[in-house]
Regions:
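Short, small-residue-biased leader/transition segments that mark boundaries at the very start
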Residues: 1-8
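Short amphipathic alpha-helical segments
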Residues: 4, 39-43, 207
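Short amphipathic alpha-helix segments
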Residues: 11-30
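A short linear hydrophobic-aromatic micro-motif
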Residues: 28-34, 171-175
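Short beta-strand elements
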Residues: 34-36, 47, 193-199
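Terminal amphipathic helices with adjacent charged low-complexity linkers/tails
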Residues: 37-60
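Short alpha-helical segments enriched in small residues
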Residues: 54-238
Length: 238
């Protein structure tokens, strides 16, 4: 048997497999299996060696057909695919810099970026602003914005991304705010997360996550970082 892996994000497993069923009918000797991971779905393509004269060509055709259908949800190839490595690589290729402001993740995003060799080319520094007072004093976010919208909000996540980007004159700024748990914050349950993403010259966007509170603090923080990296990857591939 010869296999190949592909990572897909933001797709319900049943929807994804239903969409791929017509494609796979054209390749009866290729089996497709899905594995649900915390932040993505891993597709494994398997073919019996010798079933085709050119195994690689068959995989290439199947992969191309799947990508044509699911390109906007595609993360990368291989079971050792590293999302942070991909993001850092694209930032370097495009000569862009990133910074961030983190609340619930407590610097985990910045640590993840810095774990990749060559990160100094795309990262000058960032902020850990755990308390509301730090968001105000270090980033310059107006107290009125936080008082009106709350710490755990789209507005605050976007402001964290905006103000951190402007402070360090970076191309990208990313902000993480939310509830790592186990207790609620501002009436929001554990697992509620907002991620803001600012890019120079473009409107700032945000994404809300509703992660299961039973996952625990560390899992919620880790998943938040992975979803933030996915947002970045999507922007860098535009």
């Amino acid at each position: 048997l010869v296999g190949s892996e592909m990572c897909i994000r933001d797709r319900p497993e049943s929807t994804l497999m239903s969409e791929l069923k017509p494609i796979m009918k054209d390749y009866p000797n290729v089996a497709i299996t899905s594995y649900v991971k915390p932040t993505n779905i891993e597709l494994r393509l398997t073919i019996i060696a010798g079933a085709h004269a050119d195994i690689k060509a068959t995989f290439d055709r199947v992969t191309k057909a799947i990508l044509k259908k699911e390109q906007q949800y595609y993360l990368g190839m291989g079971n050792d695919f590293n999302l942070a490595n991909e993001v850092v690589g694209l930032l370097k290729q495009q000569k862009l810099k990133i910074t961030g402001a983190e609340s619930l993740t407590g610097g985990l995003f910045q640590s993840t970026i810095c774990s990749i060799p060559g990160a100094s080319a795309i990262f000058d520094g960032g902020f850990v602003t755990y308390a509301a007072e730090a968001k105000i004093s270090l980033l310059g976010i107006p107290a009125s914005l936080i008082n009106q919208n709350g710490v755990v909000s789209s507005a605050t996540a976007q402001a964290m991304a905006d103000y951190s980007r402007k402070k360090l004159d970076a191309d990208f700024g990313i902000g993480f705010t939310g509830v790592a748990g186990p207790d609620e914050l501002e009436g929001q349950p554990a697992g509620t997360v907002w991620i803001g993403l600012a890019r120079k010259g473009q409107p700032t966007i945000s994404k809300q996550l509703r992660l299961a509170g039973y996952l625990g603090r560390q899992e919620i923080r880790l998943l938040s970082v992975q979803y933030g990296l996915q947002m970045l990857l999507k922007e860098l591939r535009k």
